[in-house]
Amino acid sequence: MHKFPWALAMLALFGASPARAAAPESAASEKPAPETPRSPDARRVIDWIAATGDNHGLPYAIVDKQAAHVFLFDARGKALADAPVLIGIAPGDDATPGVGKKSLAEIGPAEKTTPAGRFLAKFGLAAGKQRVLWVDYATSVAMHTIPKGNPKEKRRERMLSPTIDDNRITFGCINVPIAFYNRGLRPQFLKKGGYVYVLPDTKLLEAVFPPLHVQSYRKADASS
């Protein structure tokens, strides 16, 4: 399975542009940048949010775990930026009960999952007074840049690689490129927070987002 184009990942990580955010207008940049492909599940969730206003007037991000990618939208649903991500090393969509109270050394390999679901995310402080976007504070899942940590993990190289499987390396947190974090995520979420929709990698999409059942029925009725 392949990721999105290598060049896009390079731009997102090193900040040549704000993770595919718009560049200044010029004669050479009149053509709109091509959109990063979105998976069918990502498109379904994006369409559902747009149709129902599920974000309640707040910015939101879609984390597609199977594609190891995040898509950022403003409060009105305008696509702002997208970037590759690193996620929990263990497949799965549920956090282990009590995992948020454990130290990193106490978390077992099977517990290092990035839970799926809809989360009201807000900025706050983590260990070491690092400011992060808390996706699910109870389970200690946050969205932040790649930590210094252990260089043997090669997180930067994993984010740049053309494959998806090696993007599973974290304890459950969602690592994003610096440019995406500083120029996209933080300006949008800093004041009031926003919603983070984490798509599943083992469960059915409708099991994680039940309203999609209703959305499917409405589309079926409209086409009949």
Predicted stretch roles:
Residues 1-7:
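Bacterial N-terminal signal peptides that target proteins for export
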Residues 3, 16-18:
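A subset of N-terminal targeting peptides
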Residues 7-15:
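Bacterial N-terminal signal peptides
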Residues 21-32:
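Cleaved targeting-peptide boundary
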Residues 22-24, 112-224:
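Exported/periplasmic cell-wall-interacting domains
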Residues 31-32, 70, 183-184:
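Intrinsically disordered, low-complexity coil segments
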Residues 34-40:
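N-terminal targeting leaders of membrane proteins
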Residues 41-155:
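Gly/Pro-biased beta-strand-loop elements
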